[in-house]
């Protein structure tokens, strides 16, 4: 598969260091460090790739628009030109973009509308696991979820994520429960831990990690009202 990887953020030397670390040597992978869209199309016409990857769309600019790369007008015009190229050539194009603090795709909404599929790759700074979610899929279901582990030699698929979530044996301990949950079409076994103690100060402290605090307070209110639990003076 002839792949053209367009890097607008990293130099060829940086990409070479990463390829050496991963022991990756593919003669069909072509690297182009360029941000000028017209030059990218020229090189693509010479290479004739089967797949093009652009990293990232916020760094690409076109001469048609007189504004800086990453602006709304530049992202909109570059995306439209890339869409036209993909349709005329039949070459799939993978656009890599940034997300804002709210978790949405940075830039104009038209970028999300013109593409066929939107995949969000997210991770946790404390763990080596990465989650790939399908936000939009014009030709399939969005109820898909992929879990990967970042290792020294690259990403590797996690075939049994429940085994990672249940790393310890807490049999016989109070306050620990294991339940089955579904994310998309994939079942998971997750572990929930709860700790209740008498409040030392006047106002009980309620905190949650990995769970919505407002939802937890609602569940506590249901337990208090309907199940007879006395949780008013409990942390």
What do the PLM-derived regions correspond to, one by one?
Residues 5-9, 34, 50, 68, ...:
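Conserved phosphate/pyrophosphate-binding and hydrolysis machinery centered on Walker-type P-loop NTPases
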Residues 73-94, 98, 114-125, 224:
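Substrate-engagement module of ASCE P-loop NTPases
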Residues 1-81, 225, 233-235:
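Conserved inter-motif catalytic segment of the P-loop NTP-binding fold
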């Amino acid at each position: 598969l002839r792949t053209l990887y367009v890097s607008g953020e990293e130099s060829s030397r940086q990409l070479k260091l990463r390829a050496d670390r991963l022991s990756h040597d593919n003669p069909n992978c072509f690297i182009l460090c360029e941000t000028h869209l017209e030059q990218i199309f020229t090189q693509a016409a010479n290479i004739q790739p089967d797949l093009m990857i652009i990293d990232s769309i916020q760094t690409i600019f076109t001469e048609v628009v007189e504004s800086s790369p990453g602006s709304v007008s530049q992202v909109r015009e570059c995306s439209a030109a890339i869409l036209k190229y993909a349709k005329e050539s039949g070459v799939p194009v993978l656009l890599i973009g940034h997300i804002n603090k709210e978790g949405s795709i940075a830039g104009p909404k038209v970028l999300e509308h013109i593409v066929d599929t939107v995949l969000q790759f997210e991770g946790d700074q404390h763990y080596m696991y990465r989650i790939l979610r399908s936000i939009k899929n014009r030709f399939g279901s969005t109820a898909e979820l992929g879990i990967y582990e970042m290792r020294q030699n690259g990403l590797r698929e996690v075939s049994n994520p429940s085994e990672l979530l249940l790393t310890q044996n807490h049999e016989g301990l109070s306050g620990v429960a294991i339940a089955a949950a579904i994310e998309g079409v994939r079942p998971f076994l997750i572990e929930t831990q709860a700790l209740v103690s008498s409040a030392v100060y006047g106002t009980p402290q309620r905190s949650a990690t990995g769970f919505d605090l407002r939802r937890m307070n609602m569940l506590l209110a249901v337990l208090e009202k309907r199940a007879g639990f006395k949780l008013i003076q409990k942390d």
